[in-house]
């Protein structure tokens, strides 16, 4: 086994070479049927694998010779305890590794898939979202810089549409549809899953849209690099850093990231207001309602709202006879 790992004896496929070939092919498909964010994920995996192999095996690359899960187990431990990555990030890297190796096996590049029966399931993190009161604090709160104001607007737009950062950044005017009665809708395809979704613009979202449109022109020209883009969106890293400053200034005691806007739409804006789970799932562009259930945590407020909606109706349909108490003495 040691000889196989170090590449002695029979000629075996090298793991990092396999990753390089995969990334090279993947890069040619970016903006066709793959995204740059996914490519970066695989490139990050390749970097972490290189560091791990050098640290643990004292070589620049290793071969995939025999089915052996110990490598995957050690790599998982390295990501968690040496790199200090979060559970969900570790899970993503392991899935990416398994995908590359499985593809090589299916294409006949390697004889066996050493990670076929290895699984790592991350604990589901607590979903962070804004309450109704916190949304109002964010809307009326004072911010110090123009970029903070713009980042807040972008975050709030996603709170009231359910868009992810990636879908907001690519949003163009072809995806904005106006019905004969004057209502605006977003009709697009999710960049991550390629699933079609449609969502109506609520008043706050419409107000933000109008704010970034030039009055004399139907199309927003703020985005000089691509004039068809609806909003001038900063990078995700910059937006997340800016959000930390904004919530402090608005008196919100939460460590927000941009994706919390999508969680807020799923919980506070829709499910807590009685929108059925299946409908929310369609608006979010989820393939399965089970994904929506993870985003939309049931809270006591949701339970109370649901009961309140049927309380009067049940009271009219079913009446239990009351008895008068007899006087004592």
Task: Enumerate the language-model features and the residues they cover.
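C-terminal secondary-structure termini that scaffold catalytic or DNA-interacting sites
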Residues: 216-219, 225, 310-329
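C-terminal catalytic core of tyrosine-transesterase DNA break-rejoin enzymes
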Residues: 156, 160, 166-167, 245, ...
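Conserved tyrosine-mediated DNA breakage-rejoining catalytic core shared by Y-recombinases
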Residues: 125-128, 134, 170-210
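Short, polar N-cap/turn motifs at the start of nucleic acid-interacting alpha helices
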Residues: 175-181, 253-254, 274-294, 305, ...
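Catalytic-site neighborhood detector that most strongly recognizes the C-terminal catalytic loop/helix
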Residues: 129, 190-194, 236, 284-309
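Basic, Lys/Arg- and aromatic-enriched nucleic-acid-binding interface segment
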Residues: 87, 91, 110, 115-165
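N-terminal DNA-binding recognition helix of tyrosine site-specific recombinases/integrases
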Residues: 37, 44-55, 70-73, 81-116, ...
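C-terminal catalytic core of Y-nucleophile DNA break-rejoin enzymes
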Residues: 191-210, 220-245
């Amino acid at each position: 086994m040691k000889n196989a790992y170090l590449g002695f004896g029979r000629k075996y496929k090298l793991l990092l070479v396999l990753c390089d070939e995969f990334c090279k092919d993947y890069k040619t498909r970016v903006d066709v049927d793959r995204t740059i964010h996914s490519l970066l994920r695989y490139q990050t995996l390749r970097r972490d694998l290189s560091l791990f192999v050098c640290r643990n095996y004292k070589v620049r690359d290793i071969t995939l010779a025999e089915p052996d899960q110990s490598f995957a187990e050690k790599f998982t431990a390295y990501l968690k305890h040496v790199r200090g990555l979060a559970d969900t990030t570790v899970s993503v890297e392991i899935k990416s590794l398994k995908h590359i190796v499985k593809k090589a096996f299916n294409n006949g590049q390697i004889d066996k898939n050493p990670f076929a029966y290895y699984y790592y399931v991350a604990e589901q993190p607590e979903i962070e979202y804004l309450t109704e009161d916190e949304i109002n604090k964010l809307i009326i709160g004072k911010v110090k810089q123009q970029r903070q104001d713009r980042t807040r607007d972008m975050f709030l737009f996603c709170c009231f549409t359910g868009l992810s950062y990636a879908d907001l950044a690519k949003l163009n005017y072809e995806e904005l549809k106006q019905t004969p009665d004057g209502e605006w809708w977003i009709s697009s395809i999710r960049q991550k899953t390629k699933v079609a979704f449609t969502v109506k613009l609520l008043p706050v979202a419409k107000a933000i849209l109008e704010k970034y449109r030039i009055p004399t022109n139907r199309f927003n020209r703020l985005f000089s690099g691509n004039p068809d883009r609806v909003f001038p969106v900063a990078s995700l890293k910059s937006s997340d850093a800016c959000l930390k400053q904004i919530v402090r200034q608005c008196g919100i005691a939460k460590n927000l990231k941009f994706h919390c806007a999508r969680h807020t739409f799923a919980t506070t804006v829709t499910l807590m207001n009685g929108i059925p789970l299946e409908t929310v799932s369609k608006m979010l562009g989820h393939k399965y309602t089970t994904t929506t259930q993870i985003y939309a945590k049931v809270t006591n407020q949701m339970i109370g709202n649901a009961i309140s909606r049927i309380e009067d109706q049940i009271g009219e349909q079913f009446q239990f006879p009351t008895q008068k108490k007899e006087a004592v003495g």
